[in-house]
Swiss-Prot record:
It comes from the Bacteria. This is DNA polymerase III subunit alpha. It is an enzyme of class 2 (transferase). DNA polymerase III is a complex, multichain enzyme responsible for most of the replicative synthesis in bacteria. This DNA polymerase also exhibits 3' to 5' exonuclease activity. The alpha chain is the DNA polymerase. It catalyses: DNA(n) + a 2'-deoxyribonucleoside 5'-triphosphate = DNA(n+1) + diphosphate. One of its GO terms (cellular component) is cytoplasm. DNA polymerase III contains a core (composed of alpha, epsilon and theta chains) that associates with a tau subunit. This core dimerizes to form the PolIII' complex. PolIII' associates with the gamma complex (composed of gamma, delta, delta', psi and chi chains) and with the beta chain to form the complete DNA polymerase III complex. Its EC number is 2.7.7.7. Its main location: cytoplasm. InterPro entries: DNA_pol3_alpha_NTPase_dom, DNA_pol3_finger, DnaE2/DnaE/PolC, DNAPol_HHH, PHP_dom, Pol/His_phosphatase_N.
Length: 872
């Protein structure tokens, strides 16, 4: 028996091209009974373990670390023998890069193996002597001395010396081969017959190992493998629990909120809301999700209390009355016929997923609150990986080959809708591209190999994990920004560990809403209160939407969206939700049908009257997932949970799954007095549209956000457009459109007059002043200096042009340079002065001083706006 102990995956960034799955596949192909992963991190551990579990092969996990010994760096492998050892490995991964690393605290349940490196050549150090020296630090360790030549490499002889704790393995020596995969991006640079090397897996087979090692050594390796018991399934987190009576706490909070809500809305059906709340709480508590809702509620409450604007809701969570009562969402799910079971169902495995939109500028405050409230040990942000894409792969490989022009040539000829993975040199019909691919075939084929490989770790833009016990006991961590922990497990695997993920998404539109409302609201009203008072039936707002005045309006700016708005002519929030749902690939085909049915009426003769009310609200077109659920419930007499499971199954397009569900649907329909013909017609109709159905809960949440922005644009046009002008720096095309809207609305566009303008765009008395910072060559420092000059001008409004220029040049006031003054003059900053008088005097003054400051310009009128000065 043989097992490769030193193997790297592509999570040892730029040092391997083996995915954890490929590593397992290699071991399976050679009929090895176990496989080991020893990256310098634990990013791939979960993926590796699950791949081993699926392949029925024993996994061994280790960590490559470096320690200092007698002024030398020594590479070691620390391999976990037990789950306790793996937990120590996770702790070690957190601190392994610290100077003067001491391994002793992390060795319980682990084996240490010396892994020689290029620094420890036979002619510069005696690895055997080194190993004996290390054994002084790690008592009761035995050492072997047999040198092993690494195959398929021209590198020096490599020694592998094994140190093992006598208490865990008997004193017999064994010597497994250290074999670092040579299929690596790093070696691409060192060894240019590289395509051959990329295709060759330097993974020692059992047959080759038997020729290198003695039976005694292989037997000892077998003992190590047999004694290693690593099982991630036993390290899953327990359910999130913020209190021993979390279910009671949630119920009390919701009951109190419902009482207040019904008091403010006495016209509502009290029994309907109470029954809905009781049902939701029963499902939530049966699945042990109460703490999850309490945590989200706490985050939202913190935001409300600290003037941090939260979105009205996104995703299927908008369909929850509990979420609505806790102010997590702002759409009444009962009034809007939303379905809770689309969000949480006992028929569906998985944790709840509530995404919170937060104003972008204050998102970090919420994350800081999470860390302080629940503890640094119990919280972490989530790792993500930047991956090689077509362009980055070609360019990076081009650099390795010193063939940048070849990479750029390929990129220039590559169809925009194709990736390298989709191209076959023999199947390309474009002769120009075919010639390019053949000319740079090696470059192309190597780049293809690394597409979608992880390049480096990063931090997920929104994800946060919160648990009630130290996170390091379940998953590996690393230290990220602000000294906060970051998981070494990506988003894809968190739920497998039973870890609750909270998405806190920064949204610039919420920042805009907050700052615009802050500028226009009465002082005694909060931003949230102001938004809640916005009428949802404002005719002027819907007229603007129909007229396509949507520049800066959330989700509705694109040409396609404007076209749909003009056709549909929305007049309520539900219409806006339909617009958002229809303008997507797939459903777009139904836009014309929907508009025709809406404007001209639609034939209801083929629609069973029992499902007509469900389709009537969308004029006979199946648009929303909730409609599929309600139809399945009505026809097949399913519960809402079963109906949602049916919807999910049908949408997957799996023929066997569809047939299984078709049978149960027909049985339910026939038992519910539907004919086979009617049931077949309805099922086929559902099957046709189910894959494109949109979540009504999400659509309504985002429709409200779109409406808020449209209402602000309609009633506070100046503040709305001005905000976007000042926050779209670098997007000149959008700024041009915003400026044109100002002109169309009767505003005069003025140069950045030195006595009126600000650093950014500003408005006074229907005059829009360009900002100092917009002038090419003028930065924040100069713009701030000009505002300082402006303060002096306010106190001395009759200062001449010469005096003003001197102020700008004064080191105590402006501190600008002559070149800055020229830029200001060209941009029209001095147009506020009497052109025929002040400019003649100024030019005369500067000519006498031997300074030709101002360019030659007509003296009878100030220059028009020189848009080139502003990059337009």
């Amino acid at each position: 028996m043989f097992v490769n102990l030193h193997t790297n995956s592509y999570y040892n960034f730029l040092n391997s091209t083996l995915s954890p799955q490929k590593l397992v596949d290699l071991a399976v192909q050679d009929q090895q009974v176990a496989v080991c992963l020893t990256d310098p991190n634990l990013f791939g551990a979960t993926e590796f373990f699950l791949a081993c579990q699926k392949a029925h092969i024993k996994p061994l996990i280790g960590l490559s670390v470096t320690v200092r010994h007698y002024e030398q760096n020594v590479n070691l492998l620390v391999i976990a023998q037990t789950n306790r050892g793996y937990q120590n490995l996770m702790c070690l991964a957190l601190v392994k890069d610290q100077p003067d690393l001491q391994l002793e605290p992390f060795l319980d349940g682990n084996v240490v193996i010396i892994c020689t490196q290029t620094e420890l050549r036979l002619n510069t150090a005696n690895p055997v002597y080194l190993a004996h020296g290390l054994s002084g630090r790690y008592p009761k360790i035995a050492v072997t001395q047999k040198p092993v030549k690494c195959q398929n490499t021209n590198k020096d002889l490599t020694l592998l010396l094994t140190l093992k704790q006598i208490s865990q393995i008997n004193s017999e020596h064994f010597q497994p081969l250290e074999w670092k995969l040579s299929r690596s991006l790093n070696e691409i640079q060192l060894d240019p017959p590289l395509l051959q090397q990329l295709r060759h897996q330097p993974f020692l087979s059992q047959k080759a190992a038997q020729q290198i090692f003695s039976e005694e050594e292989l037997g000892n390796l077998q003992k190590l493998v047999e004694q290693s018991q690593w099982d991630l399934t036993k390290l899953k987190a327990s359910s999130l629990q913020v209190s021993h009576n979390d279910a009671q706490m949630l119920s009390e909070q919701c009951q109190l909120a419902l009482t207040e809500f019904l008091k403010l809305n006495p016209q509502l059906n009290k029994q309907l809301y109470e029954e809905r709340l009781a049902k939701e709480l029963e499902i939530i508590n049966s699945l042990h999700f109460a703490s999850y809702f309490l945590v989200v509620s706490d985050l939202v409450q913190f935001a409300h209390n600290n003037d941090i604007l939260i979105g009205p809701g996104r995703g299927s969570a908008v369909g929850s009355l509990v979420a609505f009562l806790l102010k997590i969402t702002q759409i009444d799910p009962v009034a809007n016929n939303l379905i809770f079971e689309r969000f949480i169902s006992r028929h569906r495995q998985g944790l709840p997923d509530i995404d919170i939109d937060i104003m972008e500028t204050k998102r970090d405050l919420v994350i800081d609150y999470v860390m302080q409230k629940y503890g640094r040990e119990q919280c972490a942000q989530i790792v993500t990986f930047q991956k090689f894409k077509t362009r980055s792969a070609l360019r990076d490989v081009g650099k390795v080959f010193n063939h940048i022009e070849g990479a750029e040539d390929l990129l220039g000829k590559l169809p925009k809708d194709k990736s390298l993975l989709e191209l076959d040199v023999n199947g390309v019909t474009d002769p120009v591209l075919q010639l390019s691919l053949k000319s740079f075939r090696l470059l192309w084929e190597v780049a293809r190999e690394i597409i979608n490989f992880p390049r480096q770790p990063s931090i997920h833009a929104s994800g946060v994990v919160i648990v009630t016990e130290p996170l390091i006991t379940t998953i590996p961590l690393m230290v990220g920004n602000n000294n906060n922990y970051v998981t070494q497990v990506s988003m894809d695997w968190l739920e497998w560990y039973n870890l609750n993920k909270f998405d806190l998404l920064g949204l610039i539109n919420l920042t805009m809403i907050h700052e615009v409302v802050q500028a226009v609201k009465p002082k005694e009203v909060s931003v949230q209160q102001f938004l809640q008072q916005i009428p949802l039936d404002d005719e002027a707002t819907f007229t603007n939407l129909t007229n396509q005045a949507t520049l800066g309006v959330f989700q509705l700016e694109s040409f396609g969206m404007k076209k749909v708005l003009k056709q549909i002519k929305p007049h309520n929030l539900h219409d806006l939700a339909i617009v958002l749902a229809l303008y997507r690939p797939g459903p777009q085909d139904n836009i014309n049908t929907f508009i025709a049915n809406r404007n001209l009426g639609f034939d209801t003769s083929d629609i069973d009257p029992r499902i007509l009310p469900i389709l009537k609200e969308t004029y006979g077109v199946l648009i929303f997932q909730e409609q599929v659920i309600n139809i399945a419930k009505t026809v097949a007499n399913y519960s809402l949970e079963t109906a949602d499971s049916f919807r999910r199954a049908i949408s997957k397009k799996n023929l066997q799954v569809i047939q299984d569900n078709m049978r149960s649907f027909y049985e339910g329909a026939l038992a519910n007095n539907f004919s086979l013909k009617a049931a077949t017609t309805i099922f086929n109709y559902i099957q046709r549209f189910a894959g494109y159905g949109f979540n009504l809960s999400h659509a309504l949440g985002y429709a409200l956000l779109s409406y808020w922005t449209a209402w602000l644009k309609t009633h506070y046009f100046e503040q709305f457009n001005l905000w976007w002008l000042n926050h779209e720096q670098g997007k000149k095309e959008k700024q041009k459109q915003l400026l044109n809207e100002f002109i169309s609305s009767g505003y005069e566009i003025c140069p950045p007059l030195i006595n009126k303008a600000k650093s950014d765009f500003s408005v006074q008395d229907k005059k829009l002043y360009l900002g100092f910072k917009l002038i090419n060559g003028i930065g924040d420092k100069q713009a701030h200096a000009l505002e300082h000059v402006q303060e002096v001008l306010k106190q001395n409004p009759n200062l001449s042009l010469i005096a003003t220029v001197n102020l700008c040049l004064s080191k105590t006031v402006g501190g600008l340079e002559l070149k800055d003054i020229t830029l200001l003059q060209q941009a029209g900053c001095f147009n506020c002065f009497n052109y025929t008088v002040d400019f003649n005097l100024a030019k005369s003054f500067w000519v006498q001083s031997n300074h030709e400051l101002f360019p030659k310009i007509p003296l009878d009128q100030p220059p028009v706006i020189n848009w080139k000065s502003f990059g337009f």
